[in-house]
Curated annotation (Swiss-Prot):
The keyword Heme does not apply. Belongs to the pantothenate synthetase family. Homodimer. This is Pantothenate synthetase. Catalyzes the condensation of pantoate with beta-alanine in an ATP-dependent reaction via a pantoyl-adenylate intermediate. It catalyses: (R)-pantoate + beta-alanine + ATP = (R)-pantothenate + AMP + diphosphate + H(+). It comes from Bacillus licheniformis (strain ATCC 14580 / DSM 13 / JCM 2505 / CCUG 7422 / NBRC 12200 / NCIMB 9375 / NCTC 10341 / NRRL NRS-1264 / Gibson 46).
Length: 288
């Protein structure tokens, strides 16, 4: 595995790969790798000649009072995991390399960001779109891989690629979970022991919501009430428990088509998110 630190070096390397006719699968991460990241690498390894991973804790996507400094980092551990999982090129730039002293141009996301995480994290997805535009330009990917745990991010990336006519294929990958259903996340290490047990309520609540919809419930408010009743039994503070169309993230009442049930709960030192996608069959829509 090659480790690269500068924009110039990664751009030159990946351009040469593409000139040689090789396909590149790109896995952008913020590090502190876990099995969820490894599942992205595994998929990228199967699909492409070259796998490039970036590890960059992007300061632009952290708002005031958020956990940029506290975000877990262990680059040596990550380097070993990346090498062992089949990554060919690891790109680990410093913030100064990506942004210089002060950015001249940044991205502004106009849709799909005023709900869910975007509602309480002003500017977050502008930061995501800005850094991904830079990383896509640097790594020349054929395909990019994102976990569906961050489904709103996947929706934003879908818009970014389509709106800017990027010749990149977006590959969403199913959320990787612990045995008890908790979505794997770098932030899970910040949970206290009792919070770790309580955190399983997120997936239970989502499963219950999906069950209601599959059994014919089409009132989003009724589904949200049931989800909240489960989450309220934890010590965490509910940020949101919502249902929208997917990937457009618009209100749909009654519920039809593909919808996302998404939750976010703030525990003492960790904000956890999770979601389930439910595809309502056309014949069920007609019965409404």
């Amino acid at each position: 595995m090659i480790q690269i630190y500068t924009a110039k070096d990664i751009q030159n390397l990946t351009k040469n790969y593409r000139k040689e006719g090789k396909t590149i699968g790109f896995v952008p991460t913020m590090g502190f790798l876990h099995e969820g990241h490894m599942s992205l690498v595994e998929k990228a390894r199967k699909d492409n000649d070259i796998v490039v991973m970036s590890i960059f804790v992007n300061p632009m996507q952290f708002g005031p009072g958020e956990d940029y400094e506290a975000y877990p980092r262990d680059i040596e551990r990550d380097r070993q995991l990346a090498a062992g999982s089949g990554v060919d090129v690891l790109f680990t730039p410093e913030p100064e390399e990506m942004y210089g002293q002060e950015p001249t141009v940044t991205a502004s996301v106009k849709k799909r960001t005023d709900v869910l995480c975007g509602r309480s994290r002003e500017g977050h997805f502008d930061g995501v779109a800005t850094v991904l535009t830079k990383l896509f330009n640097l790594t020349s990917p054929t395909r990019v891989y994102f976990g569906m745990k961050d489904a709103q991010q996947v929706a934003v990336v879908d818009g970014l690629i389509n709106d800017f006519f990027m010749d990149i294929e977006l590959i969403p990958v199913e959320t990787k979970r612990e045995e008890d259903g908790l979505a794997k996340s770098s932030r899970n290490v910040n949970l206290r022991a009792e919070e770790r047990q309580e955190a399983t309520a997120l997936y239970r609540a989502l499963q219950r919501g999906a069950e209601l919809i599959r059994n014919g419930e089409r009132d989003p408010e009724a589904v949200k009430r049931e989800i909240r009743s489960i989450l309220e039994k934890t010590s965490g503070v509910i940020d949101y428990a919502d249902i929208y169309s997917y990937p457009d993230l618009e209100i749909r009442d009654p519920l039809t088509g593909k919808v996302i049930i998404a939750v976010a709960v703030q525990f003492s030192k960790a904000r956890l998110i999770d979601n389930i996608i439910v595809d309502i069959p056309a014949d069920q829509k007609e019965d409404l």
